[in-house]
């Protein structure tokens, strides 16, 4: 749903041109389709995708457990809420456990089968794009945005080549520079 709304009857009949210009110039932007013209961090809904990528990459099985004692421990950490520990994949999704998906993410991008983190991150980003993130879905809506799946080149530039899995750990829980349109999220 978009807000503010408008009466579509205003766009038919003799005054449709004038009415269209009024809507187009309305500072409340009633013609702005937020479903495709804005993007937002997907947040915890992304954890399902993170789990699927982990399983596809062979670093996660549904019975794999990870501990969570209030969050993922590093620096100030990625906080989590109260729930049991350790958790398997089903419990991690059911409880929306941040720590679990931080472990999975690092195991994907820091996997020894890749020559460096940039390569591992690139594989992860390719998986994310395969779910429809970071590219237009090809609808007939005008103004559709791609969303955003950051690249290792982006982080190389932002951190002058000095970044690692902890630097970008917020991506593991659908935060940080990751962005999708509401329609991309619904398509997932």
Residue ranges, per PLM feature:
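Beta-lactam-recognizing serine transpeptidase/beta-lactamase-like catalytic domain environment
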Residues: 1-44, 49-187
């Amino acid at each position: 749903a978009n807000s503010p709304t408008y009466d579509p009857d205003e766009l038919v009949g003799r005054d449709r041109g004038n009415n269209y210009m009024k809507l187009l110039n309305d500072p409340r932007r009633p013609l702005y389709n937020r479903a495709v013209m804005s993007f937002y961090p997907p947040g915890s809904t992304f954890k399902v995708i993170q789990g699927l990528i982990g399983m596809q990459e062979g670093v996660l099985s549904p019975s794999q457990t990870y501990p969570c004692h209030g969050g993922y421990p590093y620096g100030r950490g990625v906080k989590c809420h109260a729930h049991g520990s350790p958790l398997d994949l089903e419990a991690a999704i059911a409880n929306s456990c941040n720590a679990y998906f931080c472990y999975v993410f690092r195991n994907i991008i820091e996997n020894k089968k890749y020559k460096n983190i940039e390569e591992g991150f690139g594989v992860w980003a390719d998986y994310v794009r395969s779910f429809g993130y970071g590219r237009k879905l090809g609808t007939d809506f005008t103004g559709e945005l791609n969303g955003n799946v950051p690249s290792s080149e982006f982080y190389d530039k932002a951190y002058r080549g000095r970044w690692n899995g902890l630097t970008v750990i917020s991506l593991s829980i659908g935060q940080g520079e990751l962005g999708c349109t509401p329609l991309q999220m619904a398509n997932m």
